[in-house]
């Protein structure tokens, strides 16, 4: 499965409430970098990164908009929607190797 195929399955599972299924698409050594303001936080390993998605509010949706397929890298403008919160556009980059997500980078637009 290529990056685009893997990410389509990831977003489908995440947005239909199958968070565990979405997390199963992550490599054991996945890393995620989240940018907030002038700061960034890095999570390492499927326990930390997967846990971030598993603990997110019920109803979290991440909807990819403009997608750029760069081989093993999938980049997209992602609309994030959470109940009771303002929606947010993120610049998102996902690296996929052998059908597993190995790296995630999320930054506000």
Q: Model regions: which residues?
A:
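C-terminal and inter-domain tail/linker signature
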Residues: 1-109
């Amino acid at each position: 499965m290529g990056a685009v195929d893997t990410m389509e399955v990831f977003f489908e599972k995440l947005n239909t409430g199958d968070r565990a299924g979405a997390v199963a698409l992550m490599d054991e050594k996945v890393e995620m970098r989240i940018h907030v303001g002038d700061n960034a936080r890095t999570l390492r390993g499927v326990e930390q990164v997967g846990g971030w998605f598993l603990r997110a509010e019920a109803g979290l949706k991440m909807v990819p908009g403009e997608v750029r397929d760069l081989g093993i890298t999938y980049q997209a403008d992602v609309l994030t929607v959470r109940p009771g919160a303002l929606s947010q556009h993120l610049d998102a980059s996902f690296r996929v190797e052998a059908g597993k997500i190995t790296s995630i980078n999320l930054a506000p637009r």
